[in-house]
Amino acid sequence: MTTLNQAHCEACRADAPQVSEAELPELLRQIPDWNIEVRDAVMQLEKVFLFKNFKWALAFTNAVGEIAEAEGHHPGLLTEWGKVTVTWWSHSIKGLHRNDFIMAARTDEVAKGAEGRK
């Protein structure tokens, strides 16, 4: 079985299924530090990454941007001094798809190698 951080995103259309209530616990177990947030009735995955300064936060933001471009799946990114908030959800289905969990796991992999983490 492929782990989330090794998986690749699949094309997600408006008729793609959202992650089911039955799938949710197992997927969350694989990304334990991520939180579910609900905004405008849309379930999203969110995590805050802390850095020693803005330079390292920006470098991490750019690294996440690179994996997002490579997979064709893009997060919400809020870059602040010493902090980056990453939010994954699937716009086309207005909720969570397996792709979001894949990208959250891949974001964690990027964070492991990021310089300047607190």
Curated annotation (Swiss-Prot):
One of its GO terms (molecular function) is 4-alpha-hydroxytetrahydrobiopterin dehydratase activity. It is an enzyme of class 4 (lyase). Its EC number is 4.2.1.96. It catalyses: (4aS,6R)-4a-hydroxy-L-erythro-5,6,7,8-tetrahydrobiopterin = (6R)-L-erythro-6,7-dihydrobiopterin + H2O. Keywords: Lyase. Belongs to the pterin-4-alpha-carbinolamine dehydratase family. PANTHER family: PTERIN-4-ALPHA-CARBINOLAMINE DEHYDRATASE-RELATED (PTHR42805:SF1). This is Putative pterin-4-alpha-carbinolamine dehydratase. The lineage of its organism: Bacteria, Pseudomonadati, Pseudomonadota, Gammaproteobacteria, Pseudomonadales.
